[in-house]
Every structure is written in structure tokens, then in C-alpha cells.
Amino acid sequence: MFAVLKTGGKQYKVQAGDMLRVEKLAADAGETVQFNDVLMIGGDAPVVGAPFVSGAAVQAEVVEQIKGDKVIKFVKRRRKHSSKRTVGHRQKLTLVKITEILASGADASGVKAATGKGEAAPAAKAAPKAKAAAPAAAGSDDLTQLTGVGPAAAKKLEAAGLTTFAQIAALSEDDIAGIDAIKIKPEWVEQAKELAQG
């Protein structure tokens, strides 16, 4: 039984017991990872995905984090410009050993999904948006409605503790002089009074 999996923008045909060098994964040596992007499973009853085979996965054990062979990039400018530059690059790779090919039941396996080092989990991306939406729903006003207040100035006003039009409308000249984070213009106070009323 073999499988064709996709990782790091490349496709690999693998069997149980194969050693494979793939683009760097976010896993330490000895961990077991699971490749969920399986394009095909071959054997007695081959299954081809569209584009992936649902429920299929390939599990592998991380052997070590390695670097590939050095690639030399040489730049030479010909004719009158006698300059040249040499740069070497060693790609970061992960050496894995294929342990098992699952034709189904990959969701319930409980093994960590193989992700690249630079990728972030989708749940981690959604969390900051939820935190950013929470202060807006907590009774604060959209301060960018004031003339001359953009997103950066609104953040400075919030940092100074001014989140509503009523708070800005209630500021006296002494209060305005005491705020160092941002210079509050008198017309903002007038506009805030109008917006606070309705």
C-alpha cells in the first residue's frame, strides 16, 4: 500500500518505512506528526482524491531537523563593472520516517497535524480579532467620526482612557492640558457634545 501526500508545496509517493526529507516542520525529534493532505491511496483498491482523499492521512515520526546541501549563488557583472558576489544557502529540512498510512479515520487519530515552521494555527489568527471586537462592543463609541481623528489618533485617545463621546464632551481646558498622549483640539469637544446628544 502506498500514498501520495502533499507537504511544503511538493508531492511525495510514500510507503510505510520510507525515510523522507521534507520542508521544515514545527515538530521536535521523536514526535509523531500526521500529513492530512493525501492526494491518492494506492494498493488493491486505489482511491484518488478530488483534490484530497477525505479521512485519509499519513503518519510519520520526526527523526531530526537537518539542513540541505549548500547551494552557491554567484553573481558576476561583466565588462566594465568588475564586481562579483557569492552567497550560500542551506535549506532547512525535516527528516521523517513514515510509520503508517491511514485510509480512513484520520480525524479521530489524535496525532498532531504536520505544519510548517512559519505557519500559524487558524484558531490563533481568529483570537486577536475577537479580542479587538470586544472593546468596541463594551459601550465605546467610534471616535473616528470626529473630524481629524483617524485610527491612530483613536488608539491614542483610548490609551488616554477616552472611549466615548460623552467623556470627550465633558473635558475642561485643564483636563485637556493634563493629557500628554494626544493633543485634543477644541473642535473635537464641540463635535463630541453634538454626537453624544444624538
UniProtKB/Swiss-Prot annotation:
Q: Which residues form the signal peptide?
A: none
Family assignment from sequence similarity: Belongs to the bacterial ribosomal protein bL21 family.
Gene name per UniProt: rplU
Subunit: Part of the 50S ribosomal subunit. Contacts protein L20.
Question: Do the record's keywords include rRNA-binding?
Answer: yes
MF GO annotations: nucleotide binding; rRNA binding; structural constituent of ribosome
Q: Look up the record and give one Gene Ontology term from the biological process aspect.
A: translation
Q: SUPFAM superfamilies from the entry?
A: L21p-like, Rad51 N-terminal domain-like
What InterPro entries has UniProt attached to this entry?
bL21-like (IPR028909), bL21-like_sf (IPR036164), DNA_repair_Rad51/TF_NusA_a-hlx (IPR010995), Ribosomal_bL21 (IPR001787)
Native species: Ruegeria sp. (strain TM1040) (Silicibacter sp.)
Name recorded for this polypeptide: Large ribosomal subunit protein bL21
Q: Which GO terms describe its cellular component?
A: cytoplasm; ribonucleoprotein complex; ribosome
Q: Which Gene3D superfamilies match?
A: 5' to 3' exonuclease, C-terminal subdomain
Instruction: Enumerate the UniProt keywords alphabetically.
Output: Ribonucleoprotein, Ribosomal protein, RNA-binding, rRNA-binding
Q: What does this protein do?
A: This protein binds to 23S rRNA in the presence of protein L20.
Origin superkingdom? Bacteria
User: Can you tell me where the transmembrane regions are?
Assistant: none
